UniProtKB/Swiss-Prot annotation:
Subcellular location: Cytoplasm, Cytoskeleton, Microtubule organizing center, Centrosome; Cytoplasm, Cytoskeleton, Microtubule organizing center; Cytoplasm, Perinuclear region
Positions of modified residues (Phosphoserine): 73
Family membership noted in the UniProt record: Belongs to the TUBGCP family.
Keyword line: Cytoplasm, Cytoskeleton, Microtubule, Phosphoprotein
Lyase among keywords: no
Lineage: Eukaryota, Metazoa, Ecdysozoa, Arthropoda, Hexapoda
The protein's assembly and partners: Gamma-tubulin small complex (Gamma TuSC) is a heterotetrameric complex which contains two molecules of gamma-tubulin, and one molecule each of Dgrip84 and Dgrip91. The gamma-tubulin in this complex binds preferentially to GDP over GTP.
One GO cellular component term: microtubule
Designated name of the protein: Gamma-tubulin complex component 2 homolog
GO molecular function: gamma-tubulin binding
Chief location: cytoplasm
GO BP, sorted A to Z: astral microtubule organization; centrosome cycle; cytoplasmic microtubule organization; meiotic cell cycle; microtubule nucleation; mitotic cell cycle; mitotic spindle-templated microtubule nucleation; regulation of cell cycle
Amino acid sequence: MYALLVFVERYSECKPVSESSSSTSLSAMGLPHGNKTSDVNSAAGSVPTTLAIASTSTILTTSQNVSGSTRLSLTQSQDFPTSTPVNCKKATESDTTPVVFVRRGPMDRNRGAGKDERNDLSVIKERVLNAVSDQSLSGYRSVTNKTGNSPKSMPNDLVTLTDVPDEYRTHLLWEYYKVDGDKVPRAEIAAMPLLSQESMLLDELLHCLTGIRESLLVPQKPIISAVGLAKYDTDFDIHTHLDRSLTHQVREILPLASYFMGVQKIIAATDGLGQVMNSLNEALQELTHDFYLIIVQAEQELRHNRLTLQKLLYYLQPTMWVMHEVWSSLVIIQLSDSRDAEVLTYLHERIKRLEGNKDAQQLIIGLVRKAAKPYMRMLQMWIQKGVIVDRHREFLVVDNEVIHRDELPEHYSDDYWERRYTLRDEQIPSFLAKYSDKILRTGKYLNVIRQCGKRVMPTQEMNLEFDPTSERHVSVINDAYYFAARMLLDVLLTENDLMGHLQSVKRYLLLNQGDFTMQFMDACEDELTKNVDHVLPMTLENLLGLTLRISSARNDPYKDDLHCELLPYDLVTQMSKIMKKEENWQAQPRLDLSGLECFAFTYEVKWPCSLVLNHISISKYQMLFRQLFYCKHVERQLCKIWKENSIARQFEPQAASLYRAAFTLRQRMMNAIQNLEYYMMIEIIEPNWHIFIEKMKTVENVDNVLRLHQDFLDSCLKNCMLTESSHLNRSIFKLCKICLKYCEFIQITQRYFQDAELRSMVRDSADSSESEQESLHCPQIETPLDPTDTFSERVRRFDLEFTQLLISFLKQINSMAKKNTADCFMNLVHRINFNAFYTDQMDKMCVEDAIG
């Protein structure tokens, strides 16, 4: 329709053609001449293009009624731009000579129209609008004779559009386009015989089924406030003078016209809204074409007088059922504003609900298969090459292009794995939901392989298509996943020696290299006992390098990846921040800590091994290292005072008895610290490491490697009491602190032991009674630690404080063991309290807690 309006606005009309010429033109297009206009309209109902052709021919035919003064001529070379093919006749000496209109180029479309031609534009519009109306050819002649040839006698606004916005209207959307004008009264339908009524009704019904407005079947104006399915439903007013039997039958067929027009509206409204919708609309266009073929076949039957309403209803009944299913599905999609993957999900679920309706189910299966083609093409590119081609953001994987591996902070190189590619949940079709994680990992693997400088070459070509009746796409996804997983695993384990790096990390950060640990502590003890602000990192690095080259670690190929680090927080703070996944650690105020409390080893690892040994994993290793290293330092200090206190053997028996309490306390401290170290290193770390290594021998993909490695670290942290929920690490830290204070106290009082020894040697030559009296009082010399306390009193206080802390620690372990018997905490209790020395005191504390 719009093509015809553009045609008449830009160009003048052709010369008049005789009736025989017009008839010949219609015959040349395959339409029977000599029939009434409804036959032409019937042929036009088959496809909208045919309607445009027939209307143009009618324009040329009716031009013979115009007076000679208004006739216009065109040169033979004149051509016309149209959106649909246009055929007409050119007036020449011979009326039967056909005229062929050639499409003009864009630059020539505004040329060739004279001033006189533009003056008669209103006359041409009048003829076009009347030609496509429901008037017959003779009726149009009556109108022109009655109104005359003056363009001023015609109204300016003859056309009333439907409620569909112009931007939704396409050459396929007719939607009962209404043309108002002077109507030629038809014969009274009530006065016609029943067969004539049925024949006329059939003719108009076939037009109505394709969206052409007729007089007996008038579509009602859409209700603006309609909601739900009614928004895309069309009701019709049937002529009241029709026979009731015909009215009843036509009412059963008219819903098909409503379904068809609703489908056309949705096609027009969703055009260009993504690849999935475009592909679905293409499939619906094929369905529309098949529907037009059915109407054409019905028209052929009508021309041969072999069609009745009852037969038409019988023929169209299966089509109505199927079209209703298509219409209702599309309306629900449109009302819910579903797009892309949501459309595929709805149609896929709709298939399951149509188990009893095979025809409708097969049709929806065909629609889903075609609508999913662009989505499956994107999926194939992702799992085959790791590439995303998604202009409309329809795919389930999104590429966060802002995050690049080379631009990431040093501590977050593993974020390339975690953040570069992520799932878009709203774009996952239901039939891919179970495999979405596998799809994501497949493309990730391929991209990591490409980042390692290797070329991604699939072993075989794949053709990924979605078929709701089979699971072939699942096998294609699985094959692509296993190929990428095996290839990346080979890159990590073989080409980059991931296991060698893991062994090196365990050797240094979990104190598995015993001789290196002791030599390093001997070399760095003086430096680490300073305040952290006075410790020189360069000195530590030099001592580390020296120790690595004189110990058995000199043969380690990755020893140069080990470095020293001074952290601005203690172990408790680090543990809290790791468990809470905080990142801005440097924002906290600096604490007054010693170098020993802030020291940790760090391990420098390069891509792609940083996927496994990422910053969080190294931080967890550091937590284990710091607790083990601190306990090892406490053990060394206790051993040192044991050596220095050997001088007490030279004391007199009465004087030496005063030191027995100090020696006993030191031994109890040594027993607790050594058993704590043995528990963490031998009973926790080694068994878990052995399990981890055994599982790594059968691993199939990198995600399993990540999972196994994290399970190993988490299990070690939990059983080594380094989780925020247990608070046991605070008790361990307090125990170590009291042990170090005790060692410091013993070392400070060491000179008094030496004085006592010298005095005892001098007094051997003096009076024996005086010597005994002074030797008895010698250990009771006041110390600078506390002028009011004697040595034995200080030892007694240390004993009481240590015992209370240790019993509280054991009590906490007992409490946790009751809640979770699978933990290994009770082994530590049995080791420390091996002779039930602390049992009575623990029971006493439990009773006191229960009472008050």
